[in-house]
Amino acid sequence: MKIDILTLFPEMFSPLEHSIVGKAREKGLLDIQYHNFRENAEKARHVDDDPYGGGQGMLLRAQPIFDSFDAIEKKNPRVILLDPAGKQFDQAYAEDLAQEEELIFICGHYEGYDERIKTLVTDEISLGDYVLTGGELAAMTMIDATVRLIPEVIGKESSHQDDSFSSGLLEYPQYTRPYDYRGMVVPDVLMSGHHEKIRQWRLYESLKKTYERRPDLLEHYQLTVEEEKMLAEIKENKE
């Protein structure tokens, strides 16, 4: 995958040199390039200006971003504008992006963008219902969530298929050694070696956690007959 990032602060992206994303770059599975669009600003390197019609704050000018975009070698990229008013990012969207070969992220700053910049864009995306000082942190979050889904980036594909949200439910509790730590012991079923009972326990706990913490997810989740019975039991036990 090739990712190009248009930003005023390329130095903010140093975390992408480490951990899973960094290893993906080392393996040649990922190429990330940074483009400081201030370098393409014609007007005394100014990237922002006052909005027509008045108003608070400054807007990013179209020219530096258009020229930076035009200079990128690309074929048919998905172009993502980080915008608080955009569609909210989620796991399904990360899975969609992971299928792409080329991504371009445009990171804003100041009050907003000249509206004409949006003609370059295929997707306007928000990290959530809050405002950051710029799009860099949002872009890094989306890149991290996306890159880990690329085949061969994580050793076992099943290791992310069981993640919270990938299945539509929150992930079940997990334990490792020692069996007993400060009086807190691992559930016996996980020590039993009985694969079917372990599967049922994990599914039950996943449903329980989702019902207790994110019941909104269940509104769009297609329950199996087995899951319906488990959820009914969970609700009964809560009463």
Swiss-Prot record:
GO CC, alphabetical: cytosol
Similarity field: Belongs to the RNA methyltransferase TrmD family.
Domain of life assignment: Bacteria
UniProtKB keywords: Cytoplasm, Methyltransferase, S-adenosyl-L-methionine, Transferase, tRNA processing
Protein's cellular compartments: Cytoplasm
Enzyme Commission number: 2.1.1.228
Role noted for this protein: Specifically methylates guanosine-37 in various tRNAs.
Any Gene Ontology biological process: tRNA N1-guanine methylation
Reactions catalysed according to its record: guanosine(37) in tRNA + S-adenosyl-L-methionine = N(1)-methylguanosine(37) in tRNA + S-adenosyl-L-homocysteine + H(+)
InterPro entries given in the database record: Alpha/beta_knot_MTases, tRNA_m1G_MeTrfase_C_sf, tRNA_m1G_MeTrfase_TrmD, tRNA_m1G_MTases_N, tRNA_MeTrfase_TRMD/TRM10
Chief location bin: cytoplasm
Nucleotide-binding recorded as keyword: no
Protein name, UniProt field: tRNA (guanine-N(1)-)-methyltransferase
Residues the entry annotates as binding S-adenosyl-L-methionine: G108, L127, G128, D129, Y130, V131, L132
UniProt key word rRNA processing: no
UniProt enzyme class: transferase
CDD domains assigned: TrmD-like (cd18080)
Pfam families: tRNA_m1G_MT
Assembly and binders: Homodimer.
GO terms, molecular function: tRNA (guanine(37)-N1)-methyltransferase activity
